[in-house]
Amino acid sequence: MFIKQSEKNTPKCLYKKKGKVRVLLTGSCKKLNTWKMHLWPVSPPQLLRIPPRNAELGEGTKIDDCNILQSMTLPQANVLIMLTPTRVLIYNFKPMALVASHERTMASLKEFGDNRSMKRSAPYNDIIEGLISKKDSQYLLWHQGKLIFYVMTDKNFLLTYQILKNCTNEIIFKEYGIPVIEPLLMSEEEANSAEYDYNNDDDTLTVFDKNSSSRIIQNGFGITKEKGFLHFLSNQENIDELPVKKLELRLKVVLKFDYEIIDMIGIKTFSKVGDGRYEEVLIVLFPHGLQILTISDFKVSKSSLVEVKKGSKTIVCNKQLMVLSHDSVEKQTIVSIIDIEKQAVEAIPLTDTPDELLTCLEVNGYLVVVYKEKIICFDTRIKKVSHSWKPPFVIKLCDKINDKILLLVSEDSVNIHFYTEFGNLLFATYFDEDDYNGDNNNDNSKDKNEKKAAEYKISDFVCLDKSLITVSHSGKYQVWKLWEEIKQTQFDFRNPKCYVLTNTNNDVIIYSPVTSSSINNDNLQVIKLPTKTFNNHIAFVKINSSLRLFATYVSNKNILLIHNLETNMWSSFADQNVLDLHWLGDNYLVCHMKNDDGSTNLKCLQIPLQEANPDVELSDYVMWEYNVPENTIVFSLHVNTLSRYKLLKMKSKNHNASEKQPDALLKTAEIILVTDTQTIVFDVISTVHPCGLNIIKKFYQYLKINIPIDVLPNKIEWIINMKEGLLFFADRKFIKLGKVDGGGWQTLTLLDNIEKIIDVIRDEIFVVQGHNYVVYSLEDLWDDKKPLVSIPIEEDLYPISTTPETATTHTLHCIFNARFSKLVVKHQIYLDQLILAKLEDNTDLEDISHNYRFLKPYKFALEKILSTKILRSDSLDDILKLIKMYDNTDPEHNISPPTHSGMLEIISNCLRKIETKYWNHLFTNLKMTPRDLLALCIEENEAKMLGVLLLVFLNYDEKDLGDDLHFKKSDLGTEESKALNDNSTKKSEKSVTNLLKDEELMLKVLELLVTSAANATDPIKATDSWDMCFQLIRLLKELDRENNTQLVQKALERFK
């Protein structure tokens, strides 16, 4: 590959330019999907290295210029920046390509010092009190001025760099699919005015193969292009390329400071002087205070100082400027909130923080303070600590990689960890040296990149557009491709939600716990979008209730795709401006759409379940439309399909109530629109077809209510109409909005520290609260009662879905090593925890049995509870009563099971899983002996349970069995257990050893097993029964090694 390097101490482009024809995609903007959460690796990372310096520093220099100190992205310019002690490297982010660099000379290093760190001048899309107004923040979203970043040196100089690139946010989004815009806040006129001619031949860079000038290597794909204008235009593969655009890097000015620069923030503002102009605001933290500098045309125009002592970090959080300092004597961290206009400081202490803080972050309006062994989340609104947690390792690096996920690097600089904001682990890399020794045992290997990955020491990382870049002190960097969750925000209370992941390779992963669906419930189904381009931004992926229809919106290309999962047919609708979409039941799609004039409306589309007609336009499917009032900002749209349909009492013209079920009108769902002024609830009125499908007849505006002051409408993630009120999930809290006696409305916070709603199915809601998986009934949640169950979340097993019918939680786990990465679904039954919680609350045993006995894992749950209580030497009274109730006749379902079938199965499985020294605790409370168990199996012809018990007895040595079945004082330590021990020693019939020597009983057992095997119609059951017979013959032989009895002969005689 031919790359022209820079030889002077000035930034230059590293690529040769070549003209290229592009077609600019037109169309209006759309709201980007903000409901992104989980991240998982697609594969192990690709390991790369930065190039060496072009000009040598000179002999005797001890600077290690391979040390990558920091990495940073400028998303609005599709740029990645890497900083070394003497260089600034500018990469085109997508596709990855080095396009410019600045190499500092020895004279520059001696005068200004080595590079230490860097900060970008960031356009904030929110208010900063005293700096950026609401109007300015919206304007700066689109007109962001110059691309500026600052490099701090170890001699307290600021090197101010500018990147000149002919691009806008709109173009970066459309051409590369990088989500850098929020178009809903901008008018169509502003969006179009920001566009320019992207076909500029002088902007496109092309890399040629140095051995063949006709072979172009540009974005990782080698394409041979013959000369000739017509062929160049007609080459179809050319359309799939992503262009690498020219940029220019300039060092504009060097700022000198007399004090140590501890930290700084760069902010863009828009001056109101004259016609207005862009200004750079530098907020620099010194040991003596915080200095605010206003820079216009790279000259300081204004300066002010706020006195803050011993500051270590500065940050903008929840529209406020803050400085953090640490008091090692008092062992506390001070959060100083700065009032810029009044030049005042409000100090709030965070106690019990003995360590120096590493860094601080802003996550969803909360201040996250990171220490080496602890992370604290501070609520800046109420000025109190929300929660804190400790990872099981010492932290070296921590930063957020999206609004929900923190990436932590351990002190060994090797392993990375994806944590949720409440400290639940999603994924971690733990490299085992054995993974590398087999492939790297060649000492003569020339390429050190093939050495063990454990040698890679991370110094920094950045994440953008489902790609994670980690850099190291050795000059190497890793490129990770990630799966990203697309949250399913619609709820069908009759069916569980799907879990959906996407990547940048046009792949979509779907998991559904529904066993009867076309999606395999044990595997993750991968769907490939019908495109070869790699610049698609997938804003939404939604699956309907029956798991037959799949809707995807590619927002940077204005394309809505609908896929039939059964027929594998795609329908494509171009030039659509979709801001949000939700499935309503099986075949209705509710869309929030933007029109050409900038107005928005809601549309309900009736999508055919069978193969769609390719000639039909999307507008032909519209069956309902609601125009959003002008100047109204829509924050979110919510669709809930109800579990219990509400019958509407409608009277005909002759005042006779209609009693025909097919014509009965039902409220089957609700659509809730949350705006900046009010919440609007639409009832969906339907009839139910005999096949089970809902047929929508009308949309009725049921309720309009003003948003309460203490609920931020832009934070609402879910809402439901309940008991003539509303239940919100907003800002990590469940908030109840109900009517009061005076006719007004009152809010009540029901739960806090809510991380995620897993699902809402029938009358139950499943959430992650802190470190726990919590199940509530909606009624209990509304009435502020206790949850049904709360279960700690295991590390690396985060719940993604649930199946109430089996009381099972489905979790996602990543199998990862140096060679491959694979996502697998694991299943955890929580029914035992649910029953145990009921027992602890002294719930009536009959109610527990009635509510849960028909769940599939019920017997397993009882067995698990019994085993746990035995091992803890707890009372077995309640659980044994519950086990015996399982075999009672059920009058409701007219079922009469065998008298002790369930109990025998539970007891035998429990004995199989606990040590023999605990058996007597069970037998004593059960008031049965081992002989009684075997006799009961024979009496009720329970061959399977009989076989299980025999196999349990066979697994123990005769001497050990006898020793274990005698209680020892040290084991139990009570007078009761001592008495039981003496009693069990005296009575030989309680000894399993003597029991197995009972000839007549063994013959009865063998007869039952042989009869069961001979009469079995199921081949598997027959095989199991014969296996048990052979095991019993082996037992009889072992018990009569000296051939003193006639056991075997009697057994044979019985079957002649």
Swiss-Prot record:
MF terms in GO: guanyl-nucleotide exchange factor activity
Membrane topology term: Peripheral membrane protein
Signal peptide from the UniProt entry: none
One GO cellular component this record assigns the protein to is: cytosol
The source's superkingdom equals Eukaryota
Which Pfam families does the record associate with it?
A: RIC1 (PF07064)
Q: Name one GO biological process term.
A: retrograde transport, endosome to Golgi
Compartments where found: Golgi apparatus membrane
Its chief place of residence is Golgi
Keywords in alphabetical order, please.
Golgi apparatus, Guanine-nucleotide releasing factor, Membrane, Transcription, Transcription regulation
Q: What InterPro entries does the annotation carry?
A: Ric1, RIC1_C
Q: What else is known?
A: Present with 78 molecules/cell in log phase SD medium.
Q: Please describe what this protein does.
A: The RIC1-RGP1 complex acts as a guanine nucleotide exchange factor (GEF), which activates YPT6 by exchanging bound GDP for free GTP. It is thereby required for efficient fusion of endosome-derived vesicles with the Golgi. The RIC1-RGP1 participates in the recycling of SNC1, presumably by mediating fusion of endosomal vesicles with the Golgi compartment. May also be indirectly involved in the transcription of both ribosomal protein genes and ribosomal RNA.
For this chain, the family text in UniProt reads: Belongs to the RIC1 family. Highly divergent.
Q: Describe, as the record does, how this protein assembles with itself and its partners.
A: Forms a complex with RGP1.
**Which PANTHER family does the UniProt record give?**
GUANINE NUCLEOTIDE EXCHANGE FACTOR SUBUNIT RIC1, RAB6A-GEF COMPLEX PARTNER PROTEIN 1
This one is known as: Guanine nucleotide exchange factor subunit RIC1
Supply the gene name.
Answer: RIC1
